[in-house]
Amino acid sequence: MKYLISFLFLALAFSMKSEAKVTLPSILGDNMVLQQQAEVKLWGKARSNATVTVKTSWNGQTYKSSSDGKGGWSLTVSTPVAGGPYKIIFNDGELLTLQNVLIGEVWFCSGQSNMEMPMGGFDRQPVRGTNDIIAKAKPSTPIRMYTTDSKDGRWVRQFSKTPVEDCQGEWLENTPVNVSHISAVSYYFARYIQEVLEVPVGIVVSTWGGSKVEAWMSRESIKPFSSIDLSILDNDAEVKNPTATPCVLYNGKIAPLTNFAVRGFLWYQGESNRDNTDLYLNLMPAFVADLRAKWGRGELPFYFVQIAPFNYEGADGTSAARLREVQLQNMKDIPNSGMVTTMDVGHPVFIHPVDKETVGNRLAYWALAQTYGMKGFGYAPPVYKSMEIQENKIYINFDNAQRGLSPMWTSLKGFEIAGEDKVFYPAFAEIETTTARLAVSSDKVSHPVAVRYAYKNY
Protein backbone atom coordinates (compact mmCIF):
# COMPACT_ATOMS: atom_id res chain seq x y z
CA MET A 1 0.00 0.00 0.00
CA LYS A 2 1.48 3.31 -1.01
CA TYR A 3 2.18 5.78 1.79
CA LEU A 4 2.12 9.50 1.22
CA ILE A 5 3.06 12.03 3.85
CA SER A 6 0.76 15.01 4.08
CA PHE A 7 1.09 17.99 6.41
CA LEU A 8 -2.52 18.85 7.08
CA PHE A 9 -3.46 22.44 6.46
CA LEU A 10 -6.42 20.72 4.84
CA ALA A 11 -7.54 22.23 1.62
CA LEU A 12 -10.26 19.56 1.71
CA ALA A 13 -12.26 21.31 4.41
CA PHE A 14 -14.86 18.59 3.96
CA SER A 15 -14.63 15.63 1.60
CA MET A 16 -17.25 15.54 -1.12
CA LYS A 17 -19.85 12.78 -1.08
CA SER A 18 -21.39 13.86 -4.39
CA GLU A 19 -21.89 16.99 -6.46
CA ALA A 20 -24.57 18.14 -4.02
CA LYS A 21 -24.23 21.48 -2.23
CA VAL A 22 -24.26 19.76 1.15
CA THR A 23 -20.88 18.28 1.94
CA LEU A 24 -20.02 16.08 4.90
CA PRO A 25 -16.85 15.18 6.80
CA SER A 26 -15.42 11.77 5.93
CA ILE A 27 -16.64 10.23 9.19
CA LEU A 28 -20.24 10.73 8.00
CA GLY A 29 -20.76 8.49 5.01
CA ASP A 30 -22.31 5.46 3.41
CA ASN A 31 -21.91 2.25 5.46
CA MET A 32 -21.34 4.08 8.75
CA VAL A 33 -22.54 2.95 12.17
CA LEU A 34 -24.19 5.49 14.46
CA GLN A 35 -24.28 5.01 18.22
CA GLN A 36 -27.62 3.56 19.27
CA GLN A 37 -30.06 5.26 21.65
CA ALA A 38 -28.09 8.48 21.65
CA GLU A 39 -28.29 12.12 20.66
CA VAL A 40 -25.99 12.05 17.63
CA LYS A 41 -24.51 15.12 15.98
CA LEU A 42 -24.53 15.52 12.19
CA TRP A 43 -22.63 18.40 10.66
CA GLY A 44 -21.11 19.69 7.45
CA LYS A 45 -21.04 22.48 4.90
CA ALA A 46 -23.77 23.90 2.69
CA ARG A 47 -24.56 27.08 0.83
CA SER A 48 -24.07 30.04 3.15
CA ASN A 49 -27.10 31.21 5.11
CA ALA A 50 -29.20 28.32 3.84
CA THR A 51 -31.74 26.06 5.52
CA VAL A 52 -30.48 22.49 5.73
CA THR A 53 -32.96 19.68 6.36
CA VAL A 54 -32.04 16.16 7.41
CA LYS A 55 -34.51 13.27 7.22
CA THR A 56 -33.76 9.99 9.00
CA SER A 57 -35.47 6.89 7.66
CA TRP A 58 -35.60 5.05 11.01
CA ASN A 59 -38.29 7.41 12.28
CA GLY A 60 -39.27 9.46 9.24
CA GLN A 61 -38.47 12.62 11.16
CA THR A 62 -37.11 15.79 9.54
CA TYR A 63 -34.61 18.00 11.39
CA LYS A 64 -33.63 21.54 10.41
CA SER A 65 -30.53 23.70 10.75
CA SER A 66 -29.35 26.99 9.28
CA SER A 67 -25.88 27.34 7.81
CA ASP A 68 -23.74 30.28 8.86
CA GLY A 69 -22.01 32.79 6.63
CA LYS A 70 -19.29 30.28 5.84
CA GLY A 71 -21.74 27.47 5.18
CA GLY A 72 -21.16 25.57 8.40
CA TRP A 73 -24.11 23.84 10.03
CA SER A 74 -24.85 21.15 12.58
CA LEU A 75 -27.80 19.49 14.25
CA THR A 76 -28.58 16.60 16.56
CA VAL A 77 -30.71 13.56 15.75
CA SER A 78 -32.03 10.84 18.05
CA THR A 79 -31.05 7.28 17.23
CA PRO A 80 -33.19 4.23 18.07
CA VAL A 81 -32.17 0.80 19.32
CA ALA A 82 -29.73 -1.09 17.11
CA GLY A 83 -30.88 -1.87 13.60
CA GLY A 84 -30.73 -0.94 9.93
CA PRO A 85 -29.86 -0.45 7.20
CA TYR A 86 -31.24 3.07 7.03
CA LYS A 87 -30.94 6.17 4.87
CA ILE A 88 -30.23 9.77 5.85
CA ILE A 89 -31.28 12.46 3.36
CA PHE A 90 -29.67 15.91 3.47
CA ASN A 91 -31.16 18.84 1.57
CA ASP A 92 -30.21 22.50 1.18
CA GLY A 93 -32.01 22.74 -2.14
CA GLU A 94 -30.10 19.81 -3.57
CA LEU A 95 -30.28 16.29 -2.17
CA LEU A 96 -27.52 14.15 -0.71
CA THR A 97 -28.41 10.66 0.54
CA LEU A 98 -26.33 8.41 2.77
CA GLN A 99 -27.06 4.73 2.21
CA ASN A 100 -26.63 1.54 4.19
CA VAL A 101 -26.39 3.24 7.59
CA LEU A 102 -26.53 0.99 10.65
CA ILE A 103 -27.34 1.81 14.26
CA GLY A 104 -25.34 -0.01 16.93
CA GLU A 105 -22.25 0.28 19.12
CA VAL A 106 -19.31 2.51 18.12
CA TRP A 107 -15.81 2.43 19.61
CA PHE A 108 -12.84 4.74 18.97
CA CYS A 109 -9.54 2.84 18.72
CA SER A 110 -6.14 4.52 18.80
CA GLY A 111 -2.46 4.08 19.65
CA GLN A 112 0.75 3.07 17.96
CA SER A 113 1.81 0.13 15.80
CA ASN A 114 0.41 -2.73 17.86
CA MET A 115 -3.02 -1.12 17.54
CA GLU A 116 -2.36 -0.25 13.91
CA MET A 117 -1.16 -3.74 12.87
CA PRO A 118 -3.76 -4.98 10.37
CA MET A 119 -5.41 -8.37 10.19
CA GLY A 120 -3.26 -9.06 7.13
CA GLY A 121 -0.12 -8.26 9.13
CA PHE A 122 2.84 -6.05 8.31
CA ASP A 123 5.50 -7.05 5.78
CA ARG A 124 7.16 -10.24 7.08
CA GLN A 125 5.18 -9.85 10.32
CA PRO A 126 1.98 -11.91 10.22
CA VAL A 127 -0.93 -11.97 12.63
CA ARG A 128 -1.63 -15.51 13.74
CA GLY A 129 -4.86 -17.18 12.67
CA THR A 130 -6.33 -14.38 10.58
CA ASN A 131 -6.30 -15.97 7.13
CA ASP A 132 -9.43 -18.02 7.75
CA ILE A 133 -11.26 -15.08 9.33
CA ILE A 134 -10.37 -12.78 6.43
CA ALA A 135 -11.46 -15.33 3.83
CA LYS A 136 -14.83 -15.86 5.51
CA ALA A 137 -15.64 -12.17 6.04
CA LYS A 138 -19.10 -11.29 4.69
CA PRO A 139 -20.84 -7.91 4.28
CA SER A 140 -23.88 -9.43 5.97
CA THR A 141 -21.93 -9.48 9.25
CA PRO A 142 -22.80 -6.06 10.72
CA ILE A 143 -19.28 -4.86 11.48
CA ARG A 144 -18.22 -1.61 9.83
CA MET A 145 -14.77 -0.07 9.87
CA TYR A 146 -13.43 3.46 9.49
CA THR A 147 -9.68 4.13 9.40
CA THR A 148 -8.13 7.59 9.25
CA ASP A 149 -5.49 8.05 6.54
CA SER A 150 -7.06 5.37 4.33
CA LYS A 151 -9.23 5.78 1.26
CA ASP A 152 -9.50 3.80 -1.97
CA GLY A 153 -6.52 1.64 -1.00
CA ARG A 154 -4.16 4.58 -0.49
CA TRP A 155 -2.75 6.01 2.72
CA VAL A 156 -2.11 9.69 3.38
CA ARG A 157 -0.48 10.18 6.77
CA GLN A 158 -2.19 13.15 8.39
CA PHE A 159 -0.95 15.58 11.01
CA SER A 160 -1.24 19.28 11.66
CA LYS A 161 0.07 22.06 13.88
CA THR A 162 -3.49 23.26 14.44
CA PRO A 163 -6.79 21.35 14.76
CA VAL A 164 -8.43 20.60 11.41
CA GLU A 165 -12.06 20.05 10.51
CA ASP A 166 -11.74 16.86 8.48
CA CYS A 167 -9.41 13.97 7.78
CA GLN A 168 -9.14 11.36 5.08
CA GLY A 169 -11.00 8.12 5.74
CA GLU A 170 -14.04 6.10 4.75
CA TRP A 171 -16.49 3.60 6.20
CA LEU A 172 -16.08 0.07 4.83
CA GLU A 173 -18.15 -3.08 4.97
CA ASN A 174 -17.02 -6.44 6.31
CA THR A 175 -15.38 -7.93 3.19
CA PRO A 176 -12.16 -9.97 2.93
CA VAL A 177 -10.17 -7.10 1.39
CA ASN A 178 -11.42 -4.56 3.89
CA VAL A 179 -10.89 -6.82 6.89
CA SER A 180 -7.33 -7.58 5.80
CA HIS A 181 -6.46 -3.88 6.16
CA ILE A 182 -8.20 -3.10 9.46
CA SER A 183 -6.52 -3.01 12.87
CA ALA A 184 -6.40 -6.60 14.15
CA VAL A 185 -6.88 -5.74 17.83
CA SER A 186 -9.83 -3.49 16.97
CA TYR A 187 -11.39 -6.05 14.67
CA TYR A 188 -11.13 -8.91 17.15
CA PHE A 189 -12.74 -6.65 19.74
CA ALA A 190 -15.56 -5.70 17.38
CA ARG A 191 -16.06 -9.30 16.26
CA TYR A 192 -16.37 -10.51 19.84
CA ILE A 193 -18.81 -7.92 21.12
CA GLN A 194 -20.88 -8.18 17.93
CA GLU A 195 -21.30 -11.92 18.43
CA VAL A 196 -22.26 -11.46 22.07
CA LEU A 197 -24.48 -8.37 21.84
CA GLU A 198 -25.92 -9.28 18.43
CA VAL A 199 -25.98 -5.65 17.28
CA PRO A 200 -24.04 -3.78 14.58
CA VAL A 201 -20.61 -2.61 15.68
CA GLY A 202 -18.56 0.21 14.22
CA ILE A 203 -14.87 0.80 14.90
CA VAL A 204 -13.19 4.14 14.23
CA VAL A 205 -9.44 3.53 14.02
CA SER A 206 -6.88 6.33 14.24
CA THR A 207 -3.30 5.13 14.74
CA TRP A 208 0.35 5.80 13.89
CA GLY A 209 3.20 3.41 14.60
CA GLY A 210 5.97 4.65 16.87
CA SER A 211 3.90 7.52 18.25
CA LYS A 212 4.27 9.04 21.70
CA VAL A 213 1.19 9.92 23.72
CA GLU A 214 2.23 13.60 23.55
CA ALA A 215 1.49 13.59 19.82
CA TRP A 216 -2.10 12.48 20.53
CA MET A 217 -2.81 15.16 23.14
CA SER A 218 -4.49 18.49 22.51
CA ARG A 219 -2.68 21.71 23.21
CA GLU A 220 -5.04 22.44 26.09
CA SER A 221 -4.31 19.13 27.80
CA ILE A 222 -0.53 19.24 27.38
CA LYS A 223 0.04 22.92 28.19
CA PRO A 224 0.30 22.36 31.98
CA PHE A 225 3.38 20.15 31.44
CA SER A 226 6.09 22.80 31.33
CA SER A 227 8.83 20.33 30.38
CA ILE A 228 7.20 19.77 26.98
CA ASP A 229 8.25 22.26 24.32
CA LEU A 230 5.30 23.50 22.26
CA SER A 231 7.15 26.23 20.35
CA ILE A 232 7.07 24.32 17.05
CA LEU A 233 3.29 24.75 16.99
CA ASP A 234 3.72 28.53 16.74
CA ASN A 235 6.66 28.91 14.37
CA ASP A 236 7.38 28.06 10.74
CA ALA A 237 9.61 25.07 11.47
CA GLU A 238 8.83 21.88 9.58
CA VAL A 239 7.46 18.97 11.58
CA LYS A 240 10.05 16.31 10.75
CA ASN A 241 8.94 13.67 13.23
CA PRO A 242 5.16 13.86 13.72
CA THR A 243 5.04 10.77 15.94
CA ALA A 244 7.10 12.58 18.60
CA THR A 245 5.81 16.14 18.08
CA PRO A 246 3.25 17.25 20.66
CA CYS A 247 -0.36 17.72 19.52
CA VAL A 248 0.07 17.14 15.77
CA LEU A 249 -1.65 13.73 15.69
CA TYR A 250 -4.45 14.98 17.89
CA ASN A 251 -4.93 17.92 15.52
CA GLY A 252 -4.93 15.81 12.37
CA LYS A 253 -6.43 12.48 13.48
CA ILE A 254 -8.61 13.06 16.58
CA ALA A 255 -9.89 16.64 16.45
CA PRO A 256 -11.90 16.03 13.23
CA LEU A 257 -13.71 13.11 14.88
CA THR A 258 -14.75 14.43 18.29
CA ASN A 259 -18.27 15.34 17.11
CA PHE A 260 -18.92 11.70 16.21
CA ALA A 261 -20.73 9.86 19.01
CA VAL A 262 -18.95 6.79 20.41
CA ARG A 263 -19.55 4.37 23.27
CA GLY A 264 -15.95 4.40 24.47
CA PHE A 265 -12.23 4.33 23.75
CA LEU A 266 -9.68 1.55 23.16
CA TRP A 267 -5.98 2.41 23.46
CA TYR A 268 -2.79 0.40 22.77
CA GLN A 269 0.32 2.54 23.14
CA GLY A 270 3.28 3.13 25.42
CA GLU A 271 6.30 1.49 23.82
CA SER A 272 7.54 4.88 22.60
CA ASN A 273 7.23 6.47 26.04
CA ARG A 274 9.59 4.13 27.88
CA ASP A 275 12.22 6.86 28.08
CA ASN A 276 10.26 8.94 30.62
CA THR A 277 7.84 6.84 32.61
CA ASP A 278 7.44 9.45 35.36
CA LEU A 279 6.04 11.87 32.80
CA TYR A 280 3.83 9.19 31.25
CA LEU A 281 2.29 8.53 34.65
CA ASN A 282 0.82 12.04 34.60
CA LEU A 283 0.26 12.46 30.87
CA MET A 284 -2.17 9.56 30.57
CA PRO A 285 -4.80 10.81 33.05
CA ALA A 286 -4.64 14.24 31.41
CA PHE A 287 -4.98 12.67 27.96
CA VAL A 288 -8.02 10.60 28.94
CA ALA A 289 -9.73 13.46 30.77
CA ASP A 290 -9.30 15.64 27.69
CA LEU A 291 -10.64 12.98 25.33
CA ARG A 292 -13.76 12.72 27.44
CA ALA A 293 -14.12 16.50 27.59
CA LYS A 294 -13.71 16.88 23.84
CA TRP A 295 -16.39 14.25 23.12
CA GLY A 296 -18.62 15.82 25.77
CA ARG A 297 -20.42 12.59 26.62
CA GLY A 298 -19.46 12.16 30.23
CA GLU A 299 -16.99 9.67 31.65
CA LEU A 300 -16.78 7.40 28.60
CA PRO A 301 -15.03 4.07 29.28
CA PHE A 302 -11.32 3.88 28.46
CA TYR A 303 -9.87 0.39 28.07
CA PHE A 304 -6.18 0.05 27.26
CA VAL A 305 -3.48 -2.54 26.71
CA GLN A 306 -0.37 -2.92 28.85
CA ILE A 307 2.67 -3.23 26.59
CA ALA A 308 3.90 -6.76 25.92
CA PRO A 309 7.30 -8.18 26.88
CA PHE A 310 10.06 -7.53 24.33
CA ASN A 311 13.86 -7.37 24.47
CA TYR A 312 14.27 -3.61 24.11
CA GLU A 313 17.82 -2.36 24.00
CA GLY A 314 18.86 -0.54 27.14
CA ALA A 315 21.46 -0.37 29.85
CA ASP A 316 19.44 -2.05 32.59
CA GLY A 317 16.83 -3.91 30.56
CA THR A 318 13.93 -2.69 32.69
CA SER A 319 12.44 0.26 30.78
CA ALA A 320 9.42 -1.76 29.64
CA ALA A 321 8.87 -3.08 33.16
CA ARG A 322 8.81 0.45 34.53
CA LEU A 323 6.31 1.47 31.84
CA ARG A 324 4.09 -1.50 32.68
CA GLU A 325 4.23 -0.51 36.34
CA VAL A 326 3.12 3.00 35.41
CA GLN A 327 0.32 1.63 33.24
CA LEU A 328 -0.98 -0.36 36.20
CA GLN A 329 -1.05 2.84 38.22
CA ASN A 330 -2.83 4.57 35.32
CA MET A 331 -5.63 2.03 35.61
CA LYS A 332 -5.98 2.88 39.30
CA ASP A 333 -5.85 6.63 38.70
CA ILE A 334 -8.15 6.92 35.67
CA PRO A 335 -11.83 6.42 36.55
CA ASN A 336 -13.94 4.05 34.44
CA SER A 337 -10.86 2.46 32.90
CA GLY A 338 -9.54 -1.07 32.52
CA MET A 339 -6.23 -2.60 31.50
CA VAL A 340 -5.52 -5.73 29.50
CA THR A 341 -2.35 -7.62 30.44
CA THR A 342 -0.16 -9.18 27.74
CA MET A 343 2.61 -10.91 29.68
CA ASP A 344 1.67 -14.19 28.00
CA VAL A 345 1.60 -12.96 24.39
CA GLY A 346 4.93 -11.11 24.02
CA HIS A 347 7.98 -12.24 22.05
CA PRO A 348 11.66 -11.49 22.71
CA VAL A 349 12.52 -10.36 19.15
CA PHE A 350 9.18 -9.37 17.59
CA ILE A 351 7.83 -6.11 18.98
CA HIS A 352 4.52 -6.84 17.25
CA PRO A 353 3.19 -10.03 18.90
CA VAL A 354 1.41 -12.34 16.46
CA ASP A 355 -1.46 -13.05 18.87
CA LYS A 356 -3.84 -10.14 18.48
CA GLU A 357 -6.97 -12.22 19.14
CA THR A 358 -6.17 -12.64 22.83
CA VAL A 359 -5.67 -8.88 23.18
CA GLY A 360 -8.86 -7.96 21.32
CA ASN A 361 -10.90 -10.51 23.25
CA ARG A 362 -9.59 -9.28 26.60
CA LEU A 363 -10.59 -5.74 25.69
CA ALA A 364 -14.01 -7.12 24.82
CA TYR A 365 -14.29 -8.79 28.25
CA TRP A 366 -13.75 -5.42 29.91
CA ALA A 367 -16.37 -3.75 27.73
CA LEU A 368 -18.94 -6.51 28.12
CA ALA A 369 -18.55 -6.54 31.89
CA GLN A 370 -18.05 -2.89 32.74
CA THR A 371 -19.86 -1.06 29.93
CA TYR A 372 -22.62 -3.50 29.06
CA GLY A 373 -23.15 -4.92 32.56
CA MET A 374 -22.68 -8.60 31.80
CA LYS A 375 -21.69 -11.03 34.56
CA GLY A 376 -20.44 -14.57 35.03
CA PHE A 377 -16.97 -14.35 33.45
CA GLY A 378 -13.56 -12.97 34.34
CA TYR A 379 -12.36 -9.74 32.80
CA ALA A 380 -9.91 -8.01 35.16
CA PRO A 381 -6.39 -9.42 35.71
CA PRO A 382 -5.17 -10.39 39.19
CA VAL A 383 -3.61 -7.30 40.78
CA TYR A 384 -1.29 -7.12 43.78
CA LYS A 385 -3.17 -6.30 46.98
CA SER A 386 -0.83 -6.89 49.93
CA MET A 387 2.03 -9.03 51.23
CA GLU A 388 3.01 -10.73 54.46
CA ILE A 389 6.49 -11.84 55.50
CA GLN A 390 6.75 -15.09 57.44
CA GLU A 391 10.25 -16.44 58.14
CA ASN A 392 11.97 -16.87 54.75
CA LYS A 393 8.85 -16.45 52.59
CA ILE A 394 6.77 -13.59 51.29
CA TYR A 395 3.07 -14.29 50.83
CA ILE A 396 1.32 -12.17 48.19
CA ASN A 397 -2.43 -11.51 48.14
CA PHE A 398 -4.33 -10.42 45.03
CA ASP A 399 -7.47 -8.61 44.03
CA ASN A 400 -9.52 -10.01 41.12
CA ALA A 401 -8.68 -13.59 42.06
CA GLN A 402 -11.98 -14.83 43.44
CA ARG A 403 -11.60 -18.15 41.65
CA GLY A 404 -7.98 -18.59 42.59
CA LEU A 405 -4.81 -18.28 40.56
CA SER A 406 -3.95 -20.44 37.58
CA PRO A 407 -0.47 -20.38 36.03
CA MET A 408 0.13 -20.49 32.30
CA TRP A 409 3.24 -22.61 32.85
CA THR A 410 3.78 -25.67 35.07
CA SER A 411 6.11 -23.56 37.21
CA LEU A 412 5.71 -19.87 37.94
CA LYS A 413 8.30 -17.65 36.27
CA GLY A 414 9.53 -14.10 36.66
CA PHE A 415 9.53 -13.70 40.45
CA GLU A 416 12.51 -12.22 42.29
CA ILE A 417 13.06 -11.65 46.00
CA ALA A 418 15.44 -9.43 47.98
CA GLY A 419 16.64 -8.95 51.53
CA GLU A 420 17.74 -5.79 53.33
CA ASP A 421 20.57 -5.32 50.81
CA LYS A 422 17.94 -4.86 48.03
CA VAL A 423 19.76 -7.33 45.78
CA PHE A 424 17.13 -9.34 43.92
CA TYR A 425 17.53 -13.07 43.25
CA PRO A 426 15.38 -15.41 41.15
CA ALA A 427 12.74 -16.89 43.39
CA PHE A 428 10.58 -19.98 43.62
CA ALA A 429 6.86 -19.19 43.68
CA GLU A 430 3.96 -21.50 44.31
CA ILE A 431 0.21 -21.05 44.55
CA GLU A 432 -1.35 -22.04 47.83
CA THR A 433 -4.08 -24.49 46.96
CA THR A 434 -6.62 -23.26 49.49
CA THR A 435 -6.18 -19.51 48.93
CA ALA A 436 -5.63 -17.03 46.12
CA ARG A 437 -2.15 -16.14 47.25
CA LEU A 438 1.44 -16.91 46.33
CA ALA A 439 4.32 -18.02 48.50
CA VAL A 440 7.67 -16.72 47.20
CA SER A 441 11.12 -17.66 48.48
CA SER A 442 14.78 -18.09 47.56
CA ASP A 443 17.50 -20.12 49.24
CA LYS A 444 19.77 -17.07 48.77
CA VAL A 445 17.55 -14.78 50.87
CA SER A 446 16.90 -15.84 54.45
CA HIS A 447 15.18 -12.63 55.56
CA PRO A 448 13.21 -11.23 52.61
CA VAL A 449 11.83 -7.69 52.58
CA ALA A 450 10.81 -7.17 48.94
CA VAL A 451 9.46 -9.11 46.00
CA ARG A 452 8.88 -8.21 42.36
CA TYR A 453 7.46 -9.85 39.26
CA ALA A 454 8.49 -9.61 35.59
CA TYR A 455 10.73 -6.65 36.29
CA LYS A 456 12.62 -6.79 33.04
CA ASN A 457 11.87 -6.01 29.42
CA TYR A 458 11.31 -9.67 28.57
Please report, for each region that a protein language model flagged, where it lies by residue.
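Cell-envelope and extracellular/periplasmic
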Residues: 21-458
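Bacterial Sec-dependent N-terminal signal peptides
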Residues: 1-23
